[in-house]
């Protein structure tokens, strides 16, 4: 997608609302070597507080100045959210970003243990993760690598039942 945007001289926008400040300090852009022109952030950025951010180079961001481009937002600069964000960024970046390494290790261990539990109980559940983000799927494939595989092989009814049973136990994901 990025290559096509460059070819046709269209801005490359990356939505990191879910992944930004969660899978790596620079989100999936960092993990996959992407160079977006505009990026949006949310969720992990505020650590549960309503906050969002738009980032890009000066020549693009200047267009958001008052009067040039209409921009509204429901998560613009809440003080408590800004404090939580500042604190999270400071803590996660200490020790050469040790916080990100730690949550990534925890995510890897969680996925590994859940996959082992599924195998031990004969379930066709696979837990895939990128750092601390993980998701279980019910499939006979070893891994889901594209949307077609997901649509053709994942047992959504079994996932819905599993999700409900987990919620009944107070586990939400």
Regions found by a protein language model. Name each.
Residues 1-173:
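Conserved N-terminal phosphate-binding loop of PLP-dependent enzymes in the Aspartate aminotransferase
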